[in-house]
Amino acid sequence: MGSCQAGHYLHFCLAHHPPLVCATLILLLLGLSGLGLGGFLLTHRTDLRSPDIPQDWVSFLRSFGQLTLCPVNGTVTGKGRGSHIVGLLTTLNFGDGPDRNKTQTFQAQVQGSRMGLKGSFARELVLVTARVTTERTPGTCLYFSAIPEILPSSQPPIPCSEEGAGNATLSPRMSEECVGVWSHEGLVLTKLLTSEELTLCGSRLLVLGFFLILFCGLCCLTAACFHPRRESHWSRTRL
């Protein structure tokens, strides 16, 4: 009896207020999705990327334009005088080449004028180093060696250790072994959400999901209370 009455209410609302029913169903689905996603974030500590990337790092990478990284000779030495080294993780992928089984080092030197810098900074050099290791880790660490005034002031989204960064001479190998990368396509920054951010996000999604489901329940209860009662068979016969 209750299921028939609920079906009658739903049929009546669909016939007379279809936009209201569709909006309620959409809110109900959003609430259920919020509960599911919030519970997943609180129970599973997965690595999720954050869209909040420091803009000075985005502008710094875009200023390189097309970057050509070439293999280097020998071991990488220490950094130059007055230089500062910053390493960060990017989505740059060098693929599976013939030398993929050994650690490779690629470098490029970029002058400040090419990056759009003016004045005395235009003559400064920025050394970009990429170390491709044999470990199957996502992304590649890039190291930037330059004076502190040129490098971004904020912390890298995902920093890398300074191991493997510094100065070296470009190898006189064939130019085909160099890797050309457009900075606005290949050097995409990655930043993972911390455990505190995951907890905050999951709890807010749970609260939002509960609120939406409660709101949908109140809407259904209001519609059931103000719905005109169906006349019984005996009352129609009496009339």
UniProtKB/Swiss-Prot annotation:
Please give the residue ranges for the topological domain Extracellular. Answer: 39-205
| GO BP, one annotated term | apoptotic process
Recorded superkingdom: Eukaryota
Keyword Transmembrane present in the record's keywords: the answer is: yes
Output a single Gene Ontology CC term carried by this record: plasma membrane
Its quaternary structure?
Interacts with IGFBP3. Interacts with CASP8.
* Protein role: Cell death receptor specific for IGFBP3, may mediate caspase-8-dependent apoptosis upon ligand binding.
What protein does this entry describe? Insulin-like growth factor-binding protein 3 receptor
Q: Which organism is it from?
A: Bos taurus (Bovine)
